[in-house]
């Protein structure tokens, strides 16, 4: 195999929009329509799958360095989880530390501060990820995590806490976009789901740690000190990741975009230490093949024209709608209200240590995210969603019925000083447990696979758009929750979430294709005609058939 793999052959006649790409830096030629059908470049046969991808993927073996790389990148997920989960335990401890007892509105604004910051962090750092690079975008997120935690811990007024939460949110939003994007671009196809899932698992793990520390502090630490320490502890993992980022490489795709092909090759060699030089050259060729489309689009179109292209070009639009919809519906389930307001809601139910009770959904979520990420590459993203989302519907139906009878004596409202029926409180907690199990297996980690659906030239921006949709939905839920409990009651509030879950299930059924077994650069083909539910299955069948034929021939 030649080591100078810098020419990509055109698709055979009969293929869609024949394309010739010469990758040489001096003479890059791509037909005008290339970025209209990017990622459908140069197959070596008449099927949908590039044989080179099959050959290269089957040489992948996970190395100790790659495990280190994933572990460091996944700290971003832990930070995300800790800093979103700690507010539920910390807010009840604030008491009069800021000069007065926090009102429901102030609690909602403080809680929503991180979400608002995350919207800006996701949109700004996400869209700049190609220019900054994945690595530097994560470093900026770490600085935001650190600064936000310090500001909050040193606060003596509500506005100061809100500012700190906004800054912290920039880090959360940036991490939510960049970490799964970075991991997905580096991970072998066969284990990509588990690798991205490792970051997704660290989110609920961070929430468990936050709930556990919060429960301990509520039980034995003076409140006026405890809430400051809880927020301040977020500095530790952000500084650790900031220091370890020095040892992580930039994404090879970004290095090729910058014309640093030798650095990209060295990066691939370091990640895939067991691969031969020929396989590394083949991997580099594949990266160059898809990067060519990106450079063409960025060169030929202005930022405004590219932004317009995301919505006028149907394959781009379908991909963005698919991932944005799933991310938004994941928030509209209402799960995060159990984290943000765990201390408040379980306190209203009469439990003395609300933070300790909040460990129930946090621990269960972490456990079932771990199970989900362990099987996602074998079972598939779509199949998990189709199979287990109905369990969430059943659970919230139970929740609604339980809340109806629980709050009947108080006119449908949860009142702080009322002694509710112990069996009915247990029924509510049981329904929440039942809800968290399918949520952990589905939305909790699958929403973070968004980069799998997006072709390279819109991957960073598309991830930013979908994650922004996620945080906008989160904002609506978190800001409105306490007010909804007052106006609609618990029964009406969870009835609303049940409606969103049902609509989300219909969306997944028609608009969320399977990406299991397909490389991150192949999946863009799914959306050429429609949302590609059947096409994705066809691509996987053809890929498996070709791989079987290829390796049977070798034997």
UniProtKB/Swiss-Prot annotation:
It is a multi-pass membrane protein. It catalyses: myo-inositol(out) + H(+)(out) = myo-inositol(in) + H(+)(in). Induction: Expressed during growth on inositol and during sexual reproduction. Expressed during infection. Signal peptide: none annotated. InterPro entries: MFS_dom, MFS_sugar_transport-like, MFS_trans_sf, Myo-inositol_Transporter, Sugar/inositol_transpt, Sugar_transporter_CS. The chain crosses the membrane at residues 62-82, 109-129, 143-163, 166-186, 201-221, 229-249, 329-349, 356-376, 386-406, 428-448, 462-482, 488-508. This is Myo-inositol transporter 2. Residues 83-108, 164-165, 222-228, 350-355, 407-427, 483-487 are extracellular. GO terms for molecular function: transmembrane transporter activity. It is found in: Cell membrane. It comes from the Eukaryota. Transporter for myo-inositol. Its main location: membrane. Belongs to the major facilitator superfamily. Sugar transporter (TC 2.A.1.1) family. Keywords: Cell membrane, Membrane, Transmembrane, Transmembrane helix, Transport. Residues 1-61, 130-142, 187-200, 250-328, 377-385, 449-461, 509-555 are cytoplasmic. One of its GO terms (biological process) is polyol transmembrane transport. One of its GO terms (cellular component) is plasma membrane.
């Amino acid at each position: 195999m030649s080591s100078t793999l810098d020419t990509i052959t055109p698709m055979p006649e009969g293929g869609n929009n024949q394309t010739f790409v010469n990758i040489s830096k001096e003479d890059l030629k791509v037909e005008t329509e290339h970025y209209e059908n990017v990622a459908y470049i140069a197959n070596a046969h008449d099927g949908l799958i590039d044989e080179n991808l099959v050959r290269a993927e089957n040489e992948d073996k996970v190395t100790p360095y790659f495990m280190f790389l994933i572990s460091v990148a996944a700290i971003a997920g832990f930070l995300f989880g800790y800093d979103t989960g700690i507010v539920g335990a910390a807010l009840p401890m604030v008491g009069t530390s800021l000069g007065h007892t926090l009102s429901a509105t102030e609690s909602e604004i403080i809680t929503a501060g991180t979400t608002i910051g995350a919207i800006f962090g996701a949109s700004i750092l996400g869209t700049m990820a190609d220019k900054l690079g994945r690595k530097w975008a994560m470093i900026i997120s770490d600085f935001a995590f650190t600064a936000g935690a310090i500001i909050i811990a040193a606060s003596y007024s509500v506005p100061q806490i809100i500012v700190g939460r906004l800054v912290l949110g920039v880090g959360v939003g940036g991490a939510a976009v960049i970490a799964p994007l970075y991991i997905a671009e580096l991970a072998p196809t066969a284990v990509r789901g588990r690798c991205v899932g490792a970051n997704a698992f660290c989110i609920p793990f961070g929430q468990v740690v936050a709930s556990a520390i919060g429960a301990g502090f509520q039980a034995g630490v003076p409140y006026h000190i405890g809430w400051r320490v809880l927020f301040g502890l977020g500095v530790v993992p952000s500084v650790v990741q900031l220091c370890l980022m020095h040892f992580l490489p930039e994404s090879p795709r970004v290095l090729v975009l910058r014309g640093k092909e030798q650095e990209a090759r060295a990066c691939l060699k370091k990640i895939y230490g067991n691969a031969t030089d020929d396989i590394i050259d083949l991997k580099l060729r594949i990266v160059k093949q898809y990067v060519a489309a990106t450079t063409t689009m960025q060169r030929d179109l202005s930022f405004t024209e590219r932004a317009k292209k995301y919505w006028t070009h149907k394959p781009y639009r379908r991909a963005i709608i698919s991932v944005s919809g799933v991310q938004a519906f994941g928030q509209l389930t209402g799960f995060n209200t159990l984290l943000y307001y765990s201390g408040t809601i379980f306190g209203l139910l009469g439990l003395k240590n609300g933070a300790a009770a909040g460990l129930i959904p946090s621990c269960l979520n972490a456990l079932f995210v771990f199970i989900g990420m362990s099987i996602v590459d074998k079972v598939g993203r779509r199949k998990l969603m189709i199979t287990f989302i109905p369990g969430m519907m059943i659970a919230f139906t139970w929740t609604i019925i339980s809340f109806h009878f629980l709050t009947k004596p108080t006119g449908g409202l949860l009142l702080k000083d009322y002694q509710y029926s112990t069996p009915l409180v247990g029924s509510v907690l049981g329904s929440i447990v039942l809800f968290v199990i399918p949520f952990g297996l589905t939305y909790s980690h699958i929403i973070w696979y968004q980069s799998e659906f997006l072709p390279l030239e819109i991957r960073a921006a598309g991830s930013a758009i979908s994650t922004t949709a996620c945080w906008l939905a989160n904002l609506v839920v978190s800001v409105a929750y306490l007010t909804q409990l007052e106006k609609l009651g618990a029964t009406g509030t969870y009835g609303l979430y049940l409606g969103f879950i049902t609509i989300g299930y219909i969306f997944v059924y028609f608009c969320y294709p399977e990406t299991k077994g397909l490389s991150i650069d192949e999946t863009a083909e799914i959306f050429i005609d429609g949302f590609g539910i059947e096409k994705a299955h066809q691509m996987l069948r053809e890929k498996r058939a070709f791989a079987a034929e290829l390796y049977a021939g070798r034997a």
